[in-house]
């Protein structure tokens, strides 16, 4: 299962959450991860002595409760708490950290952090961050683009012209997310977010031209940091076998399953003289119309059916 360390959580959220590392630096490699019994949303929560969260957050009420406990009762409660598995403790609302809590975090190598943010907002941000950081992921070969604000993944065998097609679409004003290796993360039950590996960011490899820096050539608006995948364009060679298997009316929409998420798929035969960039734009426009309930294929079938019915019911003229 995916996991991250407390060090990474701190580094990526220090400024956003106004975090200060107070104690327990020896636990910087403590792991935060999912398991079958504890989904992502249950990893973060207010102080819980019975079923501690991986990320324990202390708000106004929790700190006030600890401060009001007698020394012996506080030690008993913290002994019970630190006997369980925790990754990090955070004190919210800019409150002073109870001395006893600081000592326990230091002795048990549990990172203790402070934030000036209110505890409900702090937990919301952490849950969203962990949902993305711990998302199930996979890597697919292709080019991921933003076409008319729709995330489009162009796939196909090697030397099918994916990069050339992407370059043409970028020159038409669309944006690139990733080339060659597309990282897909399941950030929701039916949502896949595509990103680019840091090493390949901004680069597009085109045969004959080499590696191009899209951001430098076309400007900042030509690249996107991430995009939700909505449509797959699969390029195939336009041979007799492929053309025979192709549904020309496209009555039954094709789909592809990616880590448990079903994504709409369009198969485009590649042949000399076909303007693939125009075809991709048309496929995306058609997809947008279908989202609005407008299906050109079904409209044509209904019109054809009505025409045949009218012909059958027309009176014979002798």
Swiss-Prot record:
Q: What class of enzyme is it?
A: transferase
Which reaction is catalysed here? Answer: [HPr protein]-L-serine + ATP = [HPr protein]-O-phospho-L-serine + ADP + H(+); [HPr protein]-O-phospho-L-serine + phosphate + H(+) = [HPr protein]-L-serine + diphosphate
Q: Which residues form the active site?
A: 141, 162, 180 (proton acceptor), 248
Please give the InterPro entries that the UniProt record associates with this protein: HPr(Ser)_kin/Pase (IPR003755), Hpr_kin/Pase_C (IPR011104), Hpr_kin/Pase_Hpr_N (IPR011126), P-loop_NTPase (IPR027417), Ser_kin/Pase_Hpr-like_N_sf (IPR028979)
Per the record, the GO terms for biological process are: regulation of carbohydrate metabolic process
NCBIfam families in alphabetical order: hpr-ser
Write down the PANTHER family for this protein, in alphabetical order: HPR KINASE_PHOSPHORYLASE, PROTEIN YJDM-RELATED
The identity of this protein, by name, is: HPr kinase/phosphorylase
Q: Which organism is it from?
A: Chromobacterium violaceum (strain ATCC 12472 / DSM 30191 / JCM 1249 / CCUG 213 / NBRC 12614 / NCIMB 9131 / NCTC 9757 / MK)
């Amino acid at each position: 299962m995916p996991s991250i360390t407390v060090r990474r959580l701190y580094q990526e959220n220090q400024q956003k959450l106004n975090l200060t590392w107070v104690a327990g630096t020896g636990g910087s490699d403590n792991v935060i991860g999912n398991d079958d019994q504890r989904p992502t949303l249950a990893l973060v929560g207010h102080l819980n002595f019975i079923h501690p969260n991986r990320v324990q957050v202390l708000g106004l009420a929790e700190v006030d409760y600890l401060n009001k406990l007698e020394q012996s009762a506080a030690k008993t409660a913290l002994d019970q708490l630190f006997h369980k598995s925790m990754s990090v403790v955070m004190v919210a609302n800019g409150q002073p950290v109870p001395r006893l809590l600081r000592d326990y975090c230091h002795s048990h190598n549990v990172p203790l952090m402070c934030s000036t943010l209110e505890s409900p907002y702090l937990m919301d941000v952490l849950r969203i961050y962990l949902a993305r950081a711990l998302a199930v992921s996979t890597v697919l070969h292709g080019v991921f683009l933003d076409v008319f604000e729709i995330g489009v993944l162009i796939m196909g065998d090697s030397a099918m012209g994916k990069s050339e097609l992407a370059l043409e679409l970028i020159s038409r004003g669309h944006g690139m997310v990733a080339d060659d290796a597309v990282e897909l993360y399941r950030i929701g039950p039916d949502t896949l977010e595509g990103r680019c590996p840091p090493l390949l960011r901004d680069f597009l490899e085109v045969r004959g031209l080499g590696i191009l820096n899209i951001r430098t050539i076309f400007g900042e608006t030509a690249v996107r940091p991430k995009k939700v995948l909505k449509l797959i364009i699969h390029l195939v060679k336009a041979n007799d076998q492929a053309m025979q298997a192709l549904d020309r009316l496209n009555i039954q929409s094709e789909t592809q399953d990616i880590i448990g998420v079903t994504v709409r798929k369009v198969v485009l035969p590649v042949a000399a003289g076909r303007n693939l960039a125009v075809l991709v734009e048309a496929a995306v426009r058609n997809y947008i119309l279908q989202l609005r309930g407008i299906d050109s294929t079904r409209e044509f079938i209904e019109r054809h059916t009505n025409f045949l019915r009218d012909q059958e019911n027309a009176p014979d003229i002798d």
